Amino acid sequence: MVKVTFNSALAQKEAKKDEPKSSEEALIAPPDAVAVDCKDPDDVVPVGQRRAWCWCMCFGLAFMLAGVILGGAYLYKYFALQPDDVYYCGLKYIKDDVILSEPSADAPAARYQTIEENIKIFEEDAVEFISVPVPEFADSDPANIVHDFNKKLTAYLDLNLDKCYVIPLNTSIVMPPRNLLELLINIKAGTYLPQSYLIHEHMVITDRIENVDHLGFFIYRLCHDKETYKLQRRETIRGIQKREASNCFTIRHFENKFAVETLICS
């Protein structure tokens, strides 16, 4: 009988030679295998959520841009917009009700009174802004006045009452901005002697205006947060004007070659 034996060392050596092949086979994935990325489910953002976040980002940027544009326009209107010319001047007028065809140099000086105003002209916007300070002797109220030729409106802010009054622009009394500017230049240069007469106009308060937004930027700026009322004009005459004693106040001003006394009654 023949006994067959195997060398254990040789068997272990051959087993070690076969190990790299098996490891290489383990690294080669079959063609139909699917790769799986093992991540934490909490770290994965759904596609719908990412799209919603992108839309919110876009809308937020759009609103910010719109706010910057509107805010810039608002600041420009309030701070950067300057009048083309600013004048502080006065006009002498005859107080009594004597009708003169032309102002006379022989008229007694005591009959003349003076209106002083601060006038700002926004020629490009066709707007005149008149500030009447507290008169020294006359029994009239200080006021701020806006004549808006684009809106065809006039607004009076009585500074004593802190109330606004709006009426259609009377172009027969109020000079256009360019003409008024020429008049003021002539007065300043001394080529025109501002001695004139007084026109009376009578207005009656009617309805209250709840919203002044539609009255234009300049009147809105004047009358915002003020009680604002409509005015109705009565017949404007030169000379004596019958007045009602109760609930009336006057504003004396000029935006022409003559002075105007505006009587406003409730």
From Swiss-Prot:
Region Necessary for interaction with APP and inhibitor effects on APP processing, annotated ranges: 102-134
Swiss-Prot/TrEMBL GO biological process terms: negative regulation of amyloid precursor protein biosynthetic process
Segments forming domain BRICHOS: 137-231
Transmembrane feature ranges: 55-75
InterPro entries per the UniProt record, alphabetical: BRICHOS_dom, ITM2
Residues at the site labelled Cleavage: R243, E244
PTM field: The ectodomain C-terminal part of the imBRI2 is processed by furin producing a secreted Bri23 peptide and a mature BRI2, membrane form (mBRI2). The remaining part of the ectodomain of mBRI2 containing the BRICHOS domain is cleaved by ADAM10 and is secreted (BRI2C, soluble form). The membrane-bound N-terminal fragment (BRI2C, membrane form) is further proteolytically processed by SPPL2A and SPPL2B through regulated intramembrane proteolysis producing a secreted C-peptide and a BRI2 intracellular domain (BRI2 ICD) released in the cytosol.
Keyword Glycoprotein carried by entry: yes
Family stated for the protein in its record: Belongs to the ITM2 family.
Subunit structure, interactors included: Homodimer; disulfide-linked. Interacts with SPPL2A and SPPL2B. Interacts with APP. Mature BRI2 (mBRI2) interacts with the APP amyloid-beta A4 protein; the interaction occurs at the cell surface and in the endocytic compartments and enable alpha- and beta-secretase-induced APP cleavage inhibition. Mature BRI2 (mBRI2) interacts with the APP C99; the interaction occurs in the endocytic compartments and enable gamma-secretase-induced C99 cleavage inhibition. May form heterodimers with Bri23 peptide and APP amyloid-beta protein 40.
Function, as annotated: Plays a regulatory role in the processing of the amyloid-beta A4 precursor protein (APP) and acts as an inhibitor of the amyloid-beta peptide aggregation and fibrils deposition. Plays a role in the induction of neurite outgrowth. Functions as a protease inhibitor by blocking access of secretases to APP cleavage sites. Mature BRI2 (mBRI2) functions as a modulator of the amyloid-beta A4 precursor protein (APP) processing leading to a strong reduction in the secretion of secretase-processed amyloid-beta protein 40 and amyloid-beta protein 42.
PANTHER family assigned to the protein according to its UniProt record, in alphabetical order: INTEGRAL MEMBRANE PROTEIN 2B, INTEGRAL TRANSMEMBRANE PROTEIN 2
Protein name: Integral membrane protein 2B
Gene: Itm2b
